[in-house]
Design a protein with these regions (language model features):
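N-terminal leader/linker segments that initiate helical-solenoid repeat arrays
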Residues: 19-73, 77, 261-267
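Terminal, low-structured helical/coil segments at or just beyond the last alpha-helical repeat
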Residues: 27-40, 215-267
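Structural marker of alpha-solenoid helical repeat scaffolds
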Residues: 44, 78, 112, 146-148, ...
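Residue-level recognition of tetratricopeptide repeat
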Residues: 48, 82, 116, 150-152, ...
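TPR alpha-solenoid repeat register
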Residues: 85, 119, 126, 153-155, ...
Length: 267
């Protein structure tokens, strides 16, 4: 697998990775006035469903999706109201390409627990894939509004990418800038923010992010090519030559190398 494809796959997996972690005994209350559910409060059926879901999570993380799905079904047969099981079922269906079933599962998880930020994020990202951008934004905002949510950078990134796909460059820049503020070392954030800034004609800021990215081990054909395009727009021939040498040396068979050889800077 090429480094470019690995980067793209890592991006897609990263956007959902934190959502497949095993649920803990203590769970977020469904409303701000509800108390936290701790181990002593946990009914027997809920405990059994949680253990099944934890087992399913292990299978899911090993790539054994159908086995995980079977465990999830047993968890939900025990306790149909256990939101984390519905969220994990959505991830399993998503991996299997069952977009409609995945959407139904994420929606059920959010309905059961409106403060399940991971499920809201997943539903938002799936809606983005389905080009339902308005609903995607609703769910991203829901996730970001949950107090104590620890994956805000991931959601701001997804929201920014989704806004860019919808054609709202200003909103994309705002979300991606927030993602960068929270996670400045993330190469996917840097690349997508630079791409949006380039599209808006803000070449100096795009250059800043690409200098950091292309000077790191995370540089790939896409980031180098974008860097070349930025330097070309800024009239920096030395920068163009330097990045072009890197692209030809490190990614000689890439589509970006072919564009460089054609001088197709505006494709």
């Amino acid at each position: 697998m090429t480094k470019r494809l690995m980067w793209v796959c890592a991006f897609l997996v990263w956007l959902l990775a934190g959502c497949a972690s095993a649920p803990s005994t203590g769970s977020v209350p469904a409303s701000k006035d509800a108390d936290w559910v701790t181990e002593s409060d946990e009914p027997e059926l809920r405990k059994r469903a949680r253990i099944r879901t934890e087992l399913a999570t292990g299978y899911f993380e090993q790539g054994k999706t159908t086995i995980a799905l079977d465990e999830i079904k047993q968890a939900l047969a025990t306790d149909p109201t256990y939101a984390p099981a519905h969220n994990l079922r959505g991830l399993a269906y998503l991996r299997l390409g069952e977009m409609g079933l995945a959407r139904d599962s994420f929606q059920r998880a959010v309905t059961l627990n409106p403060r399940d930020a991971d499920a809201a994020h997943n539903l938002g990202w799936l809606n983005c894939q389905l080009k339902d951008y308005a609903e995607a934004n609703v769910q991203f905002q829901r996730a970001l509004g949950v107090q104590g949510y620890t994956s805000a950078a991931k959601t701001h990134l997804a929201q920014g990418v989704c806004s860019a796909r919808s054609g709202n460059a200003a909103a994309a820049e705002q979300s991606l800038s927030k993602a960068f503020e929270l996670d400045p070392a993330n190469p996917v954030v840097s690349y997508n923010l630079a791409l949006v800034l380039f599209g808006r004609g803000d070449f100096s800021r795009a250059q800043f992010h690409l200098h950091r990215l292309n000077g790191s081990v995370h540089a790939n054909a896409e980031s180098l090519w974008l860097g070349i395009r930025v330097e070309n727009k800024m009239g920096n021939n030395i920068g163009v030559r330097g990045l072009s040498e890197q692209l030809r040396l490190k990614f000689p068979k890439s589509a970006e190398r072919q564009k460089l050889d054609r001088g197709a800077f505006d494709e």
